[in-house]
From Swiss-Prot:
NCBIfam families: S18 (TIGR00165). This is Small ribosomal subunit protein bS18. It holds the Pfam family Ribosomal_S18. The gene is rpsR. Signal peptide: none annotated. Keywords: Ribonucleoprotein, Ribosomal protein, RNA-binding, rRNA-binding.
Length: 76
């Protein structure tokens, strides 16, 4: 049976020495939201718990201000 090589996950925010995640930085936030609009969990992205909490808050703020969609367009 062949074993698959699993890439080591790392926290992008720690590597870039980010102090605070901004809700106006939509390109960063979109990378952590799935196609259906759900926030991607840290066990998949490798984000540390501190930044995952900041990320969730920033995504929720951006959604509230209509900068990000709550869900996908449902393909109508």
């Amino acid at each position: 049976m062949a074993r698959f090589f699993r890439r080591r996950k790392f926290c992008r925010f720690t590597a870039e020495d980010v102090k605070e995640i901004d809700y106006k930085d939509l390109n960063t936030l979109k990378a952590y939201v799935s196609e259906t609009g759900k926030i991607v969990p840290s066990r998949i992205t490798g984000t540390k718990a501190r930044y995952q909490r900041q990320l969730a808050t920033a995504i929720k703020r951006a959604r509230f201000l209509a900068l990000l969609a709550y869900t996908d367009s449902h393909g109508r």
